[in-house]
Curated annotation (Swiss-Prot):
Residues 22-43 are annotated as: Disordered. This is Small ribosomal subunit protein uS4. It comes from Trichormus variabilis (strain ATCC 29413 / PCC 7937) (Anabaena variabilis). One of the primary rRNA binding proteins, it binds directly to 16S rRNA where it nucleates assembly of the body of the 30S subunit. With S5 and S12 plays an important role in translational accuracy. GO terms for molecular function: rRNA binding; structural constituent of ribosome. Disulfide bonds: none annotated.
Amino acid sequence: MSRYRGPRLRIVRRLGDLPGLTRKSARRAYPPGQHGQNRKKRSEYAIRLEEKQKLRLNYGLTEKQLLRYVRRARRVTGSTGQVLLQLLEMRLDNTVFRLGMAPTIPAARQLVNHGHVTVNGRVVNIASYQCRPGEEIAVRDKAPSRKLVENNLQYPGLANLPSHLEFDKNKLVGKVNGVIEREWVALQVNELLVVEYYSRQA
């Protein structure tokens, strides 16, 4: 399954706010479609599926990519759900987004893919790169790169910088000081239901 490229507000109306996908909020509180207001009682499977879709669409992942992250999380000691969120939050595209360099994760991914971002002084154009504590995430020292990010900083995606990050707006340099804590994950999701969804596949 490829990344979602359709209308974003339809997804937000169905799943709730997805801060990584879009800054817009749905005006209507019910899902799209002719029968959107007449929701039947959902099965446990449908609830788990919805939580999985939230996670996948918010971080802009394919089905295969998310399954790989679940498998990686299972191999790490600790709560699989929490480790899964940490792996996704520490991706380079998400870190660029959380630093405020881009208004959404898709926009941050584009910055990374086009070579506008450096890690410890070297250009890294792999959006899935896992950021580690102590690393410096900066805008490439080129006029087009700086102009892009300076424009983005006027309309940040999220107001609050997570406690594990710091960012110098004048130098356009950020630093990863640790691993994100659960309370700083902006997406409202039940990660345990996502792990349960994949329990037979991972």
